[in-house]
């Protein structure tokens, strides 16, 4: 088989009380040949289910401003942009901004 996509969900240590309710998406990737088929959204939904099953209430993630498709996927899945870092990456001599998102996945935070 060939890997079509992946999502890496990171859970904080339970000893970190201040963020013990929040999981983060570290990597979310869909191969170019597999895009446009809903896989990115299905991976997100699976990650949210896993986080809920482990009693997490929120998921956070970050994305480069140049990743337009990913931004559309996150926003259509209910993620809210809460911040921008003007210099998130430097590629060559170009400064690229980064966006920060969150989604509450339980009623506990509403």
Task: Mark where each language-model region is.
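Conserved phosphate-binding and hydrolysis motifs of nucleotide-dependent enzymes
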Residues: 1, 5, 38-40, 78
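Acetyl-CoA-dependent GNAT
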Residues: 1-33, 44-46, 50, 87, ...
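Short glycine-rich loop/turn motifs that provide flexible caps or phosphate-binding loops at active sites
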Residues: 4, 22, 37, 82, ...
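Conserved glycine-rich acetyl-CoA-binding loop
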Residues: 18, 27, 31-45, 54, ...
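C-terminal "cap" of GNAT-fold acetyltransferases
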Residues: 57-60, 64-71, 77, 87-110
